[in-house]
Amino acid sequence: PYKDTTREFQWKKMKERLSLLESIQKEPFQWAILQNYKNRNGEAPLVKVFKRDAYKRVSDTLGVERYQSVPLYLLTDTVIPEIYGRDGSLVRIKAMDEDSKFARIQTVYDGEEEWYAPKKYIKQIGDTVVFDKAIFVDRHNQNIATLEHVGSKWLVRSMNPATTGQHRPPYAQETPLGMYVLQEKKSRMIYLVDGSKETGGFAPYANRF
């Protein structure tokens, strides 16, 4: 129990996602991460159909914001992107032509769809990487669980309460659903007071997906 709510760990959903993680590794693939943290690789072009979300930011029809995202193009049209891919998302590389500025990729979370993405937004991580650790963030129950694959079993390494993002425009945003690769570890992560550049505090031993 926590205040007026009861938190629980959704083991059934975790089991389903662990099965997915195992299944995508049964055959060797060239893996990659979509990267555009803080638009470091360039602001993504406007998609064909866009809107302003509750934060007054440009987003695609699926609600993915343009800011720090990666433009994804239909296989039949590399002029204007169709949707945005989230920074940190795990993808497969299906084709990488040296003479093209695009790579053909395939998503692995919530459907296997193929897209073209500009190479400058893609970080290759090879075909020998093994995903044997998983961190589950539960937005509803506000908790986090870490598991490790040892032998033929997934072992629970930690279970803790966690404060995830909340949908509170114009500043606070909910943690987006998806399958992300750990990109950065920090001894401390500084956060700001909403709507200002004033430091609000820090979180120790933070991981950025």
Predicted regions and their residues:
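Short, structured beta-strand/loop micro-motifs enriched in basic residues and often containing a Trp
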Residues: E65-D77, I125
